[in-house]
């Protein structure tokens, strides 16, 4: 059991670090009485408690998906660039094929007009 003691201590401390911030607001929170200013409209005229399910343009979704895809591409390039002097020709050309596939995908998105904001 002594070999598992550090793991158990780590788990207890991590649970406390997670649960204490969740429990502290219950100790210091007010009764739920709200001020009328909190329920009034903002300076811009929006109600603070409106419908959260408002419609948004699908182009925002497409741009975010493209950002995630090309951001993941960059995360693949960092380890490849660090180990470039240790990998052989196969590693180099496999990354070039990966880059070519992503470039073709990017050009396809561009040709279809997913990046045009009209």
UniProtKB/Swiss-Prot annotation:
Q: Which UniProt keywords apply?
A: Electron transport, Membrane, Mitochondrion, NAD, Respiratory chain, Translocase, Transmembrane, Transmembrane helix, Transport, Ubiquinone
UniProt membrane topology term: Multi-pass membrane protein
Q: Which transformation does this protein catalyse, written as a reaction?
A: a ubiquinone + NADH + 5 H(+)(in) = a ubiquinol + NAD(+) + 4 H(+)(out)
Q: According to its record, what are the GO cellular component terms?
A: mitochondrial membrane; NADH dehydrogenase complex
Query: Where in the cell does this protein reside?
Result: Mitochondrion membrane
* A GO term, aspect molecular function: NADH dehydrogenase (ubiquinone) activity
Q: What is its EC number?
A: 7.1.1.2
- Give the chief site where it resides: mitochondrion
Q: Where are the transmembrane segments?
A: 9-29, 62-82, 87-107
PANTHER family according to UniProt = NADH-UBIQUINONE OXIDOREDUCTASE CHAIN 3 (PTHR11058:SF9)
Family that this chain belongs to: Belongs to the complex I subunit 3 family.
Q: What does this protein do?
A: Core subunit of the mitochondrial membrane respiratory chain NADH dehydrogenase (Complex I) that is believed to belong to the minimal assembly required for catalysis. Complex I functions in the transfer of electrons from NADH to the respiratory chain. The immediate electron acceptor for the enzyme is believed to be ubiquinone.
Identification of the protein by name: NADH-ubiquinone oxidoreductase chain 3
Q: Which gene encodes it?
A: NAD3
